[in-house]
Every structure is written in structure tokens, then in C-alpha cells.
Amino acid sequence: MTLLIKNGRLVDPKSNRDEVLDILIENDKIVKIGLNLSVENAEIVDARGLVVAPGLIDVHVHFREPGQTHKETIHSGAKSAAAGGFTRVVMMANTKPILSTPKVLTETLEIADKEDIKIDAVGSITQDFDGEHLTDFDELIKAGAIGFSDDGIPLTDAGVLRKALQKAKLTDSLISIHEEDPNLIGTLGVNDGEVAHKCGFTGAPTVSEYSMMARDSMIAYETGARLHIQHLSAGESVEVVRFAKNLGAKITAEVTPQHFSITEQMIFEQGTNAKLNPPLRSTTDIGKIIEGLKDGTIDVIATDHAPHTREEKNVSLDKAPSGMIGLETSLQLGLTNLVAKGHLTLSELLTKMTVNPAKLYNFDAGYLAENGPADLVIFDAENDYQVGETFDSKATNSPFIKQKVQGQVKYTICDGKIVYQAK
């Protein structure tokens, strides 16, 4: 297949390129980038007035298959990703059964391989998330695991984490960690602040996150292994990551769009759709997170796409599951709350959604270059619209429904094929 993208604003953070150019794609590769390109029998995509960027990469999604396909399937998750401009995603291990064995992982990846986007997966750190017994890292890597995480459940035993990091270092594998100490938490999913107190319960204080993060960062420093901090939410957590990096620890960190966009007050408006682990925090926390994004302390923006059904969410705040979908609003929230407000340039935003996620797992992705992969997103960076009530995801649990955002994905191209086109 030959595809010719004409007159788009090519923004490639890896090469610091930002100029109007044409891109010629043949099969799964970019073969030419230049001005006034033409070729016979090519399908033309008119990108005039639009941004052409590397396909987005999300290193933190929950596609719920196997075992919870009433919430999401790999297929519906892949469709949601493509609609959001993502050409590659990494699934977490908290399926049913958990991705703890080569058999379950292999079967899951065989399903994922049928989709139009690239889907990878991590294996669990501990067997069935028991927090005690490590999985067989070597066998899981052979089965296709690109890293390890017990995301959704923190590793409370420091000794287990240390053993996991020591083992991961032998294969240069990435360990990704959910940082919330359950011993310091009352009710999960709600900040221990004004909202929780008005609701009459104790929530999840910021110390439950940054205290565990400090412990784990120092263990990573001691072992020399690579540790990735998932979905940090507290201002103090940014300081911990900054300190650990300055010390020389091989630490990377991610933040979700919701944690730099809205506060715990959103629970009063959106109810359980704004209940998340870790919870939404304060305006002060958002300010420190934005500073961490600006100075490079926070490396990656990831969605933590976590679908639930309406029935599951339509219960009391203390009983509802935590999580929200995010693949179809991620780029827009970055454009709206970071770029439009002058916190990041467009290239800086894209770095945290393409180049840096690719670095975590050594993907050949996240850049636009001749002979490089034909994975791209084409979007209108300035178009305002209201987030709808339906999504390509099977789920609708988003606190951003009816919110006005900036930016709209027009095309997603993966391996040289148009896998999403706006209607």
C-alpha cells in the first residue's frame, strides 16, 4: 500500500523537526519526507492545517481480557487506542487469570496480535499478585513479556521488591510499580481531604504514595535496576523522583492526564467516574506535577485506561471500583491543559507521549524518519469540541464527558495502514 500525506505540519520531537512537509509511505515504512512529493496510484491524505506526529504510545492500559470482557476486550481497547491516536500500547497484568504464567501470557498476546495497532504486555511481578513469590521472569520474557508489574496492587514487602529488582537487572527488564501503602489508607480512590471528609470517611493521603515511593526509589538505587513509577499523583512524589534521579537511581515516572487536569473536587460533579487509584488530588499537587513535567522529572504521560461498566460505577462512592477510561481524551487533555496554557510546547508534550515511552521498552517507535516505522497520528491541535457520551471503548466511565477540550484526532496510521479516520 502506498500512502502520501500532503502539506501537514510534521512535528517530530526526536529530531526537533517542526515544518510543513509531505510524507510518502510504502507498506509499513516511511520512504520519503520532503516538499512537493508526488507518486502515481498513491492514496492521498490532505493534512493541510493539521499536525502530523509519531503515533502515540501508552505504556499503561487495562484491556480486561481475559476474564473481564464485560468491561473491555482487547479489540474494543485497540479501537479506543486508535481513536485516541495511539499506535502502540502496553497492557497490564491484572486480568483474570493474571498474566503470571507463560501460557496465559502467550494466549493473550495471540489475541492482541490480531489487532490493527501494536499491543504488548507486561507479566506480573509476583504469582497471581500474591506479593510474596516472584514469577519466572525468564520464562515470561520468552513468552513475550516486555517488563513486569503488579499494577493495581502495591508491593508492600520491601524484600520482595528488592529481589524483583535484582532479578530484573540481569535481563535489563523494567519493573513498574503502583505506589500506595495500604496501611496508610482508609478508603481507596478518594484523596484524604475535603471530599472524603464531607463524605464521612478517611481517604488515601498523599503520604501513602510518596513514602512508599521513597522506599522503593532507594532500593532501586541500591540494586542499580530500572524502576518505573506509575501514575504519581502527589506533589511530594515529584520531589522524591527528582531526588532519586539526582542521586543516580535509574528511575522514570509517569503521570496521567487526569492527575494534571482535574482535582478531587470533580467527585462532587462526576461522582464515582472521578474515583481513581491513586486519587485526584489538590490544585497544589497539580502545580507541582506540571513543574515536574516541565523540568523533565516526569518522563511519560500514560492513561491508566481502566474501563468499568455503568452498573459497576453506579453504586456508592465507597463501594465503586476505581478507574476511568482515558485513551480517547489523553492527547486532548495534554493540548488543553499543558500546551494551550503555556506549560509545555507541542513538541515537549509529544516527547512524553512518543519518544520517552518508546525509550522505556526500547521500541523502534516514537519518531518520524525515512526508513522508519509508518506509525503516525494526524490531528487538529486547535479545534475545540465537547467530549461526547459514547466512545470506541466498550466503557464510558470518564469524568470528562461534556467537558470542552482542545484537539481532535483525524487519522491514526499504524504499519502504513489507516486504522482510524474521524467521521
UniProtKB/Swiss-Prot annotation:
Superkingdom, natural source: Bacteria
Keywords for the protein's UniProt record, in alphabetical order: Hydrolase, Metal-binding, Pyrimidine biosynthesis, Zinc
PROSITE patterns: DIHYDROOROTASE_1, DIHYDROOROTASE_2
Residue numbers annotated as active site: D304
Annotated Zn(2+) 1 binding sites: H60, H62, D151, D304
Gene3D superfamilies registered for this protein in UniProt: Metal-dependent hydrolases (3.20.20.140)
Cofactor binding note from Swiss-Prot or TrEMBL: Binds 2 Zn(2+) ions per subunit.
Keyword Metal-binding: yes
GO cellular-component term (any): cytoplasm
Entry EC no(s): 3.5.2.3
Chain sites annotated for binding substrate: H62, F63, R64, N94, N277, H308
Catalytic reaction annotation: (S)-dihydroorotate + H2O = N-carbamoyl-L-aspartate + H(+)
GO annotation (BP), single: purine nucleobase catabolic process
CDD domains reported in the protein's UniProt record: DHOase_IIa
Example of a GO MF term: allantoinase activity
Uppermost EC category: hydrolase
Pathway involvement of the protein, from the record: Pyrimidine metabolism; UMP biosynthesis via de novo pathway; (S)-dihydroorotate from bicarbonate: step 3/3
Cofactor annotation: Zn(2+)
InterPro entries, alphabetized: Amidohydro-rel, DHOase, DHOase/Allantoinase_Hydrolase, Dihydroorotase_CS, Metal-dep_hydrolase_composite, Metal_Hydrolase
Binding positions for Zn(2+) 2 per the UniProt entry: D151, H178, H231
Record carries keyword Metal-binding: yes
UniProt xrefs under NCBIfam families: PRK09357.1-4 (NF006839), pyrC_multi (TIGR00857)
Family (UniProt): Belongs to the metallo-dependent hydrolases superfamily. DHOase family. Class I DHOase subfamily.
Job of this protein: Catalyzes the reversible cyclization of carbamoyl aspartate to dihydroorotate.
Name of protein: Dihydroorotase
Origin species: Lactococcus lactis subsp. lactis (strain IL1403)
